[in-house]
Amino acid sequence: THSVPGSEKEGEYKEETAVEILNSMVPLWRKNKNEISTEEYNEFYKSRFTDYHDPLDVIHFKSEGTATFDSIIYIPSAAPFDFYSKEYEKGLALYTNGVMIMEKCADLVPDYFSFVKGIVDSADLNLNISRETLQQDHQVRIIAKAIDRKIKSELKKMLTNDREKYEKFFDVFGVQIKWGVYSNYGAEKDGLKDLMMFKSVKNNKYVTLKEYVENMPEGQEKIYYACGEAPEKIALLPQTEAVTAKGFDVLCFTDDVDEFAVQMLMEYD
């Protein structure tokens, strides 16, 4: 409420009530992303999720339809210090109408995206929903599927449009993607296989399976790979040299999961 000069008599004042929403009071995830600077995104991330590093990428999107929600999802630039420990908890902060229900809702992200941080705010959820009920909640499952699709879509865009950034991402979290291809008997392999990369013997640079197949010379009918500690050592193996002598490239499998992930595909078109 503020006073303005009255028009009836000089010196008279009348009361007017002005309803204003201060932009600074609107949660970041509810703002239009065109109004938010990179610095604001980064500062919010570092403050909210106690990270000293700027995030590698930000996925800010709204969904309307079967599930209506606002969300900001961050891909860290480095693995959390406890990421590979039993103490690490995956999950996104879950809100309903700006009120937090849970600090880390594990049901919102699959294990292969366990590294992401973020916030989801939906008006479709009951404020009193319990942790046990969440697992069976239809809306939560719909939201989780939408988030999964969005992260996959944004990673594919990054791979296509910003190769350098994607390779940085894959250096840090590529093993998670490969485990995602292999786990649950390959249930998610079709959505993740084109996000996998491996170093090749030919130039010691990352290639996707699609790129490898597209560059196969005439006469090559198989994908060749070799396991070892590092591409430099794999290149010196007699078996590798026998294949490269034919003009065929060899993929370097340096993580334990690599062979399992590719075998889960059975074949690659």
Q: Where do the model's predicted regions map?
A:
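Conserved GHKL (Bergerat-fold) ATPase module
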Residues: 1-269
